[in-house]
Design a protein with these regions (language model features):
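Intrinsic low-complexity, intrinsically disordered segments enriched in polar/basic residues
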Residues: 5-8, 33-35, 150, 369-371
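Core alpha-helical transmembrane segments of integral membrane proteins
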Residues: 339-375
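Short secondary-structure boundary micro-motifs
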Residues: 6-9, 13, 215, 252-253
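Soluble extramembrane regions of membrane proteins in the secretory/endomembrane system
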Residues: 30-347
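Hydrophobic membrane-insertion alpha-helices, especially the h-region
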Residues: 8-24
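Bacterial Sec-dependent signal peptides at the C-terminal "C-region" and cleavage site
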Residues: 21-33
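Short, Lys/Arg-rich N-terminal segment immediately upstream of the first membrane anchor
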Residues: 1-7, 346-348
C-alpha cells in the first residue's frame, strides 16, 4: 500500500512540475556569449542598449529621440547598409499637442547586386528580402501610482534594435553566400499608434515590394524566454523555416489569444499581406512601459535566447535558394505549434493536432482503466 501511495505521489509531482514548466515557458539557464564570440553575442547587444537606454526617448522627447535616431543611422551605415532617415508630416498626439516622426531604413543586398563584384550578379528586380523590424521610440508618459514615469526603452524596444544590429553584423560575415538580402526598418511612434509603420506601409511601397518575410522583434517585459508569440495567417511555410531555430520557444495559442487583445505591434500592420513572425519576452510585466524598463534591468539570458533562435533562421533564409520566390512563405494551412522544456518544438497540422488529442485522450482513458482496476 505504501509503495502504491509513493508511486501516486511521485506521479503527481512529476505532472505538476511539467505543467508549471510549460505554463511558465521554462527554459533551462543558458550561458551568454561574450564580446569576443564569433556568433551572436548578448554582451555586444548590451553595449548598444546602454546607448539606446541612456535617456527616455518617447514622442514627448523630441531631442533625445532625434539623437537616438542619428546613432542608429550611423550604426546601420557603418555596417555598409544603404541607409536613410525618412521624415513624415507632423501629426496630432493623443496625449496633447503635435509631434513629428521619422523611420530609419537600411538595405543590404547580396554581393553582386550592389556592385561588389560577385561573379553571380543578381539584378535588383529578382532579389527577395527579409525585413527585420523594431521600433526606436520608448513609451510616453505613464501613471504609476501617484507618479508620472517614462520608460527608458531598454527592453521595449532596445532589445529589438540591438538584436537586429547584431544579427545583421553577424550575417555580413558570410555575405558572399547570400541568395537573398536583408532590409532593416526601425520605426518611430510605435508606442503612439504604430504611426511609423502605418506611414511606411502607406507612403513607401518600395520598402515592402520585394520583401517576402517579416520578423518583428518586440518586448512585453524585460526577461524570460524569447517567445514566438505571433505568426502570419497560413503559417506552415514560415514554421518550416523557424524549425532551424536553436532552442525554439513558442505556442500557437498565444497567436489566437493575441487576436483578441487591443495592444498591437508594428507586425499587425503587415501580417495579413506579408508572411512573418513576431517575437517578445513577456516576463516581469511590472517593468513594462515604466521607468523600470532601464539598462540595469536588462536580461542577457533573454537577449541571447532571441539571438540563438533568430541567427540560424536568418542564415538559412539568406543562403537558401528555395526562399528566393516572392511567395516562398505563403501557405494554405495554419500549423499548431508549441514548445516543451528540453524536448523542443512540436508542430502539427490542424488535422494532426486533432488526431494527437484523440490519441492522448485514449491513452488517458486506458491509464484511468488500469488505475481503477488494479489500484
Amino acid at each position: 500500500m505504501h509503495i502504491r501511495n509513493l508511486y501516486k505521489t511521485l506521479a503527481f509531482y512529476i505532472c505538476a512540475v511539467l505543467a508549471v514548466a510549460v505554463a511558465l515557458g521554462f527554459m533551462p539557464p543558458q550561458r551568454t556569449s561574450g564580446r569576443d564570440s564569433l556568433g551572436f553575442s548578448a554582451q555586444r547587444v548590451s553595449d548598444d542598449i546602454r546607448v539606446i537606454a541612456k535617456e527616455p526617448h518617447s514622442i514627448q522627447h523630441t531631442k533625445e529621440r532625434k539623437v537616438l535616431g542619428e546613432f542608429l543611422f550611423y550604426r546601420l551605415q557603418q555596417m555598409g547598409g544603404d541607409t536613410q532617415i525618412i521624415d513624415y508630416d507632423t501629426i496630432p498626439s493623443k496625449i496633447g499637442g503635435k509631434f513629428s516622426y521619422s523611420n530609419i531604413y537600411s538595405v543590404y543586398p547580396p554581393q553582386g547586386a550592389d556592385g561588389t563584384g560577385n561573379k553571380d550578379f543578381l539584378p535588383d528586380s529578382t532579389i527577395s528580402y527579409i525585413l527585420l523590424v523594431a521600433h526606436y521610440d520608448s513609451r510616453y508618459r505613464q501613471i504609476v501610482g501617484k507618479d508620472t514615469v517614462f520608460s527608458y526603452g531598454a527592453a521595449d524596444d532596445g532589445y529589438g534594435l540591438g538584436i537586429i544590429m547584431e544579427l545583421v553584423s553577424g550575417a555580413l560575415k558570410y555575405r558572399d553566400e547570400w541568395k537573398q538580402g536583408v532590409k532593416v526598418l526601425f520605426t518611430d511612434a510605435e508606442e503612439h499608434d504604430m504611426d511609423g509603420m502605418r506611414s511606411a506601409w502607406k507612403e513607401n511601397p518600395e520598402i515592402f515590394s520585394d520583401v517576402n518575410l517579416v520578423v518583428n522583434v518586440e518586448a512585453r517585459g524585460v526577461k524570460g524566454p524569447a517567445l514566438l508569440f505571433e505568426t502570419s495567417p497560413g503559417n506552415e511555410k514560415v514554421m518550416e523555416l523557424y524549425g532551424e531555430a536553436h532552442r525554439p520557444h513558442g505556442m500557437s495559442l498565444t497567436s489566437f489569444v493575441y487576436t483578441f487583445l487591443s495592444n498591437d505591434t508594428d507586425f499587425s500592420v503587415v501580417k495579413d499581406s506579408i508572411p512573418g513572425m513576431n517575437f517578445a519576452v513577456i516576463d516581469n510585466l511590472k517593468h513594462y512601459h515604466t521607468d523600470l524598463d532601464n539598462y540595469s534591468n536588462i536580461s542577457l539570458e533573454s537577449i541571447q535566447h532571441y539571438g540563438d533562435q533568430l541567427e540560424p533562421v536568418l542564415k538559412e533564409y539568406l543562403t537558401g535558394e528555395e526562399y528566393s520566390a516572392r511567395d516562398a512563405f505563403k501557405g494554405e494551412r495554419d500549423i499548431v505549434f508549441f514548445a516543451l522544456p528540453v524536448l523542443g518544438m512540436f508542430a502539427f497540422s490542424k488535422g494532426g493536432w486533432l488526431l494527437l488529442n484523440a490519441a492522448v485522450f485514449a491513452l488517458f482513458l486506458f491509464v484511468l482503466y488500469i488505475y481503477v482496476k488494479y489500484f
